[in-house]
Amino acid sequence: MKRYKVYVYNTVDKFWDCYDVIAEDPVDARNVAVQRLIDETGHGLDVYEVTDVCEVKE
């Protein structure tokens, strides 16, 4: 498992946010971040846009 930073943009309130996630690959990291957005905010890709996924080098 690797550590990733997933950057998201809220298209309604116009702000950026970043999620640190542990995942197998960048696609999995994106999916984990989207699920966290849904769990934490009640919104997913209807309000947020994933803008970048970057692996964190240890």
Predicted features and spans:
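Short aromatic-glycine-(Arg/Gly/Cys) micro-motifs in beta-strand/loop hairpins
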Residues: 1-17
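A structural detector for beta-sheet-dominated domains
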Residues: 7-9, 22-24, 48-51
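Generic structural signal for short, flexible, solvent-exposed coil/loop and linker residues
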Residues: 8-12, 26, 39
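A short, exposed loop/beta-hairpin motif centered on an aromatic-Gly-Thr core
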Residues: 14-27
